[in-house]
Amino acid sequence: NLLVSNGAARSDGTHYGWFENNESGMAWKLRFKNERMIKAETWKPSGEPCYWTKKGIGVVHFYNEDGTKWRIDFYKRGKIVSRKYQRKGSIHGPWTTWYENRQKSSEENYKNGKIHGIWTKWRIDGEKRGGKHYKEGQRHGVENTWYPSGQMAMESKWKDDQLISSVAWKPNGQKCPDTNVQD
């Protein structure tokens, strides 16, 4: 069994924790300044360090006793890019992303590695950009997109990943001509 501490905090803003049976002894060490993560070092249960991507995005893994883990990707300045949960190597649960200005970019949910539920996207200014419904990896339900003005751009209906109907509007709100959906 792998046991992970809840960690501790020092007055300099460093938070740290450890795996009891980890070769290196350390699981994670995070440094905060003004409530913002400025440095992160993490290790897998094997003692192998976690990494930075080629795009300069930091990656932190936290492992739970039940074998699940959650992953946080962050910008170099410590602001979170995304947070997702994994179970048995597959994404499972919520996956949320943010712009560097801390505005939420997207929110989606996964079930055993397949997108399941509502997927919502926002623009960098916080205005809703679109939303889709999924059922076990397939589009199922209503899909909407909006213009930056907030005007509806499109509404489509899906069933088992097959398009049933779609209506589109011009930026001025005028409905576009009907189009038939064919197999």
Predicted regions, residues:
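Glycine/tyrosine- and acidic-biased, solvent-exposed loop/turn segments at the edges of beta-strands
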Residues: 1-183
